[in-house]
């Protein structure tokens, strides 16, 4: 991993934690003492950020100077300029190799049960009739 990617990841984690915390800043003035004013942790850039992010929203963080991009789904990069390849995205479609494996297992178990039942019926028939298996094979093919 490159250092730029690590820095971007760290900045995104800081921005996300600031957005989730919603801290208030204490201010004092001659008229009002210890009042709290809510300043949003993240706000949109406004007109100065138009066109900065190619596929996403331009944002300002309260504790970090500069503009940052919140990328739309399917895009990544500092300015959301890179398309995420389909191979790396998690898609809702199941993988074709894993979707038929349970069906194949059930079919194999059923075939095994059918073969076992056939062998048991042949065995019971030979015990009941006291015919050797060679004679029974001749009877089946006549």
Swiss-Prot record:
Gene Ontology terms for molecular function: epidermal growth factor receptor binding; growth factor activity
PTM summary: Cleaved at the cell surface by host ADAM10, thereby releasing the secreted form of VGF.
Signal peptide range in chain numbering: 1-19
GO cellular component term of the entry, any: host cell membrane
Side Cytoplasmic, residues: 126-142
GO process annotations (BP): epidermal growth factor receptor signaling pathway; positive regulation of cell population proliferation; positive regulation of mitotic nuclear division
Glycosylation sites: 34
Induction info: Expressed in the early phase of the viral replicative cycle.
Disulfide bonds: 71-80
Xref: InterPro entries: EGF-like_dom, GF_C11R
UniProt entry keywords in alphabetical sequence: Disulfide bond, Early protein, EGF-like domain, Glycoprotein, Growth factor, Host membrane, Host-virus interaction, Membrane, Secreted, Signal, Transmembrane, Transmembrane helix
Cleavage (By host ADAM10 protease) (site feature) positions: 96-97
Extracellular side: 20-104
Keyword Lipid metabolism in annotation: no
PANTHER family: PROEPIREGULIN, TRANSFORMING GROWTH FACTOR ALPHA
Family (UniProt): Belongs to the orthopoxvirus OPG019 family.
Name of the featured protein: Pro-Viral epidermal growth factor
Source species of the chain: Monkeypox virus
Gene (name only): OPG019
């Amino acid at each position: 991993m490159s250092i730029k990617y690590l820095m971007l990841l760290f900045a995104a984690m800081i921005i996300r934690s600031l957005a989730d915390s919603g801290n208030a800043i204490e201010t004092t003035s001659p008229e009002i003492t210890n009042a709290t004013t809510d300043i949003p942790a993240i706000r949109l850039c406004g007109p100065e950020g138009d066109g900065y992010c190619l596929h996403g929203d331009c944002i300002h963080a309260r504790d970090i100077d500069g503009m940052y991009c919140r990328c739309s789904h399917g895009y990544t990069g500092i300015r959301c300029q890179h398309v995420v390849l389909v191979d790396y995205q998690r898609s809702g479609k199941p993988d074709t190799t894993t979707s038929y494996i349970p069906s194949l297992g059930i079919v194999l178990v059923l075939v095994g049960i059918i073969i076992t039942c056939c062998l048991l019926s042949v065995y019971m028939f030979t015990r009941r009739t006291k015919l050797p298996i060679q004679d029974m094979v001749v009877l089946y093919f006549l």
